[in-house]
């Protein structure tokens, strides 16, 4: 039996393999402006800090700010219509979430993805998760690694901080958990590998979602 009762999950690279759709939308936006496209492995390195940072890393250096905003808007529009063309839960995730729900464990998703995309993907793939919080700087909720999204998730769930664990796949997630005062479980099926995670302070790592049930 797990020692945790509340689970705060990252989305991309933790619950969902979104890399193909992110790469497709990034390259679509780049293509519309005649810019070089990137491999999926390139995009894997770009993700983790929200779509603005993804596209800042994807566009050619020195791009004028006004044109960058056009590229970003093109990405956002395309992605909202193609967010689950190839996106799927990682193997073992649906079964693990089902068991956590059966046990009565409160769950939430916090992401640096756009709020609308975060909520749409969670509603589509994980209706058992009642709280999904995405990037929402306009509402005063700073993106990760600031603790704001986690704090808001705990507030909406109505749970105490000491009951919760944060689950994610990146260095941003490790920092987010630390800033929020939560233990962090780092997953090895996502966008970052074991050496990278250990280098960035990971202390608890798992290789399959079912391990969450007895960690």
Residue ranges: model-predicted function:
Residues 26, 93-123:
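Substrate-recognition element of Asp-dependent hydrolases with the DxDx(T/V) motif
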Residues 85-86, 114-165, 171-180, 194-195:
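Substrate-recognition "cap/lid" segment bordering the active-site pocket of phosphatases
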Residues 204-208:
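Short acidic-hydrophobic, aromatic-tinged amphipathic segments that line or gate anion-handling sites
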